UniProtKB/Swiss-Prot annotation:
Record's keyword terms, sorted: Disulfide bond, Glycoprotein, Host-virus interaction, Immunoglobulin domain, Inhibition of host complement factors by virus, Membrane, Signal, Transmembrane, Transmembrane helix, Viral attachment to host adhesion receptor, Viral attachment to host cell, Viral immunoevasion, Virion, Virus entry into host cell
Topological domain ranges for the Cytoplasmic compartment: 498-511
Gene assigned in the entry: gC
Organism per entry: Human herpesvirus 1 (strain 17) (HHV-1)
Name this protein carries in UniProt: Envelope glycoprotein C
Pfam family membership, one: Marek_A
Region (Disordered): 42-130
Disulfide bond entries: 127-144, 286-347, 386-442, 390-419
Annotated TM spans: 481-497
Segments of this protein annotated with the region Heparin-binding domain: 137-151
Assembly notes: Interacts with host complement component C3b; this interaction inhibits host immune response by disregulating complement cascade.
Gene Ontology BP annotations: adhesion of symbiont to host via host extracellular matrix; adhesion receptor-mediated virion attachment to host cell; symbiont entry into host cell; symbiont-mediated suppression of host complement activation
Cellular component terms per the entry's GO annotation: membrane; virion membrane
Signal peptide residues on this chain, from the entry's feature table: 1-24
InterPro entries linked to this entry: GA_GC, Ig-like_dom, Ig-like_dom_sf, Ig-like_fold
Length: 511
């Protein structure tokens, strides 16, 4: 009987061992139907090292399918290295989900994913770009897919509306909305019609659109159901709100949707240091030209590497023109030319394209100081001479006599001579003495902008005319008058003879 007792003891011990294993499996499965990819982090719930559960694989409920989202979640964020898998055992379904991490939404959720490109909803139209922002002069392509367009005689019309200060569409339309049985709002220009032979003859086509446009700015390509609107060049004139209307041939406005095209152009930066005369303050002008849209432009000025903080020294103005906007900023130094060395100015321009993107550029230039010339005027017997020493090359004189605002440059002769300073020259101009005026003005012209007017005034009594010369002049004048009277008389006689002969000829024909 000893072997029987031994066998009974072995059976009882095996049942006890098996019960312990089932109890451990149920405890592990109570955490939910997820797969445990790693060791248990709570030490109070971990099995002892000598128990069979120490080498166990993840617990799986074979009677129900585990949530795949939970599997992915636990695999991607393990807290400890994964343990070898164990044999799955049947367990009961948990009554409550784990409280540590909520279950994500199932994969068949219909909410569109948020990404850079729009998804394809089951609506009547889908466009890949509803609000493109393009650089000036670039080419823009918008691809739209029209549902059920191949099942009917499809017709597409595209209208453009401006986005100026007084847009024809107010309030701004919803770019995601699809309209039904809505005709195009008034004030638009037609840029495309897939059936141009059916277009209303009173419709206004946009520039570069319509039959015979050369060169064409708009085109629509691609086989249905996908159409691609191509704008050849984005400018302030071609940007705006585009209304796409489509439907059957007999109902082209069955559906409609909006697309917005916006343009941007960073400014070009130039710096022009002013050439100043001795005794004038240094100046420099920075220009941010032809940018769009009219977003803030900020200038920071530096004079010899020192920032100019005084707002009274900086004058900034913005001007609007057809191609965009231009901002001009001028800084005036507290230093004076001739008293200190020439100044170096640096302009730092920042233009904000939007709340995130901006452009920043720098420009540097050296302001020059020109010596103040000395102007002299000398009267001779028959000529008057005006001289200016050490002026920039290209500077010349303009003469004015009395109150006559017209310069007497036709009678002046100007010559330039070398000066001791490089880039400068001495200018001398001569003018015949006038018999009609006593006041003379010689004015320097050709200086850079910002230089004050430099001129010299002189007086000289007109000399008496030579009697013989005066008689000759009067005789010539009388001869001219006589020739004019004679020519007029000849014309009158010729006209009379012509009229008489014409009258006689008519009388002969009547007889």
């Amino acid at each position: 009987m000893a072997p029987g007792r031994v066998g009974l003891a072995v059976v009882l011990w095996s049942l006890l061992w098996l019960g312990a294993g089932v109890s451990g499996g149920s405890e592990t499965a109570s955490t939910g139907p997820t797969i445990t990819a790693g060791a248990v982090t709570n030490a109070s719930e971990a099995p002892t090292s000598g128990s069979p559960g120490s080498a166990a694989s993840p617990e799986v409920t074979p009677t129900s399918t585990p949530n795949p989202n939970n599997v992915t979640q636990n695999k991607t964020t393990p807290t400890e290295p994964a343990s070898p898998p164990t044999t799955p055992k049947p367990t009961s379904t948990p009554k409550s989900p784990p409280t540590s991490t909520p279950d994500p939404k199932p994969k068949n959720n219909t909410t569109p994913a948020k990404s850079g490109r729009p998804t394809k909803p089951p609506g009547p139209v889908w466009c890949d770009r509803r609000d493109p922002l393009a650089r000036y002069g670039s080419r823009v392509q918008i691809r739209c897919r029209f549902r059920n367009s191949t099942r009917m005689e499809f017709r597409l019309q595209i209208w453009r509306y401006s986005m100026g200060p007084s847009p024809p569409i107010a309030p701004a339309p919803d770019l995601e909305e699809v309209l039904t049985n809505i005709t195009a709002p008034p004030g638009g220009l037609l840029v495309y019609d897939s059936a141009p032979n059916l277009t209303d003859p009173h419709v206004l086509w946009a520039e570069g659109a319509g039959p015979g446009a050369d060169p064409p700015l708009y085109s629509v390509t691609g086989p249905l159901p996908t159409q691609r609107l191509i704008i050849g060049e984005v400018t302030p004139a071609t940007q705006g709100m585009y209304y796409l209307a489509w439907g059957r041939m007999d109902s082209p406005h069955e559906y409609g949707t909006w697309v917005r095209v916006r343009m941007f152009r960073p400014p070009s930066l130039t710096l022009q240091p002013h050439a100043v005369m001795e005794g004038q303050p240094f100046k420099a002008t920075c220009t941010a030209a032809a940018y769009y849209p009219r977003n803030p432009v900020e200038f920071v000025w530096f004079e010899d590497d020192h920032q100019v903080f005084n707002p009274g020294q900086i004058d900034t103005q913005t001007h609007e023109h057809p191609d965009g906007f231009t901002t001009v900023s001028t800084v005036t130094s507290e230093a004076v030319g001739g008293q200190v060395p020439p100044r170096t100015f640096t302009c730092q321009m920042t233009w904000h394209r939007d709340s995130v993107t901006f452009s920043r550029r720098n420009a540097t230039g050296l302001a020059l100081v020109l010596p103040r010339p000395t102007i002299t005027m000398e009267f001779g017997v028959r000529i008057v001479v005006c001289t200016a020493g050490c002026v920039p090359e290209g500077v010349t004189f303009a003469w004015f006599l009395g109150d006559d605002p017209s310069p007497a440059a036709k009678s002046a002769v100007t010559a330039q001579e070398s000066c001791d300073h490089p880039g400068l020259a001495t200018v001398r101009s001569t003018l015949p003495i006038s018999y009609d005026y006593s006041e003379y003005i010689c004015r320097l012209t050709g200086y850079p902008a910002g230089i004050p007017v430099l001129e010299h005034h002189g007086s000289h009594q007109p000399p008496p005319r030579d009697p013989t010369e005066r008689q000759v002049i009067e005789a010539i004048e009388w001869v001219g008058i006589g020739i004019g009277v004679l020519a007029a008389g000849v014309l009158v006689v010729t006209a009379i003879v012509y009229v008489v002969r014409t009258s006689q000829s008519r009388q002969r024909h009547r007889r």
